[in-house]
Amino acid sequence: MSLISRHHDLRDADKAAVTALATRAQQADRTPPLNEAAQLALAGRGSAHVVHWLDTSSDPAIGLIGYAQLDPRDGSVQLVVDPDHRRQGIGRALAEQIIATDHPTSWWAFGNLPGAQALASALGLTVIRGLLIM
């Protein structure tokens, strides 16, 4: 079980937990889960308008298991789930809460990973563009 919460500002401890989560995901996936704009907003050097979503385990020893960032200016969301807690419905629960509350218009998925594809399919999302790294 976990607790999903919505924030306009994050405490330093939450920022550190998100950064650690993103690092674990990047190591597992070999691609960063958040783009530069999201990283800057997380660090307080980007958009002050973003909404942070935290999914925290009910077990304090585990801590943060999911994070999403919504930019309300364009309605886009970036979402990441801790690699050790994937395939448990965490991403879907987080995404569904964001959809119900903030009505995003687009989602970013980096690396075209199977988990992101499965989540997008489950939510009825379709690919509208792709990025090629050359």
Placement of each model-derived feature along the sequence:
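Conserved beta-hairpin
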Residues: A41-G66
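Short amphipathic alpha-helix that is part of the acyltransferase structural core
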Residues: M1-L40
